[in-house]
Amino acid sequence: MTSKLDQLKKFTTVVADTGDFGAIKSLKPQDATTNPSLLLKAASSESNDQMLADAFSGAKGDIGLACDRFAVAIGQEILKVVPGRVSTEVDARLSFDTDALIERSERIIGLYDTAGISRDRVLIKLAATWEGIRAAEKLEKDGIQTNLTLLFSFAQAVACAEAGVFLISPFVGRIYDWYKKSSGTDYVGADDPGVQSVTRIYNYYKANDFKTVVMGASFRNLNQIEQLAGCDRLTISTELLKQLAEDTGTLEQKLAPGNAGEARQSLTESQFRWASNEDAMATEKLAEGIRQFARDQEKLEALLSAKKS
């Protein structure tokens, strides 16, 4: 019998949301994504102690640079076992500073360049703030492809498409979490607000011939993944990938390019900020996500500092 994971791979590019090399090898995704939380977990593993030491020794006491060096080292190892791309995230504390985001992104891609990794195998992850989207627009023009993350609203998706970013990561599970907590309803199937959000974005992009890739992220259960089968890409935790690999039920394609979508839109900065202000869920989850990634970045810096002493 064919597993649901193998069925999914027929119409969706499967991406592993992990820094676990062993899991990546066994599950054989096309790409992999990392973030500060996953890097912190990897840094806490004794098996990566040498990688941490090397990252710090080459940073000349600059903790921020050491973190970037460690992130790139993890990315290099991942690229040894995936045929496609790895996403490496910029420090979330820079999410509201366009120039700083560009500078840090260029440093990260420079580290990959030095390691001999082709730029077409790396995506730079930025939070989908207005400043992050503007930074991505500039980076894309300079040949550095981006992954806009922490995406919770249609306004963010519209702005990302207009900016010509390579890929967006709408967060299915975190949208679901907010609405479940807000309403007390346990949404299932096509009624799931996270599923509805990604479906709307996907249909809008395809109807208007945007090339930006839609990669659903942050899944809480298999049903959410199944409802988005056919999406360009889905980045999935190792736990859920294993469940898909063990399930031999039938998986139907839910999303396809021919589905109807809304007319093309564009947003000025003030319109973007107003739309964001009017969307309580998106405002709260974006702020929460940036804070969480920033705290994990700080913990990673503390861990690196402790390792060197």
Curated annotation (Swiss-Prot):
Keywords: Cytoplasm, Pentose shunt, Schiff base, Transferase. The active site is at K125 (schiff-base intermediate with substrate). Pathway: Carbohydrate degradation; pentose phosphate pathway; D-glyceraldehyde 3-phosphate and beta-D-fructose 6-phosphate from D-ribose 5-phosphate and D-xylulose 5-phosphate (non-oxidative stage): step 2/3. It catalyses: D-sedoheptulose 7-phosphate + D-glyceraldehyde 3-phosphate = D-erythrose 4-phosphate + beta-D-fructose 6-phosphate. GO terms for biological process: carbohydrate metabolic process; pentose-phosphate shunt. Its EC number is 2.2.1.2. Homodimer. Belongs to the transaldolase family. Type 1 subfamily. This is Transaldolase. It comes from Pseudomonas syringae pv. tomato (strain ATCC BAA-871 / DC3000). The gene is tal.
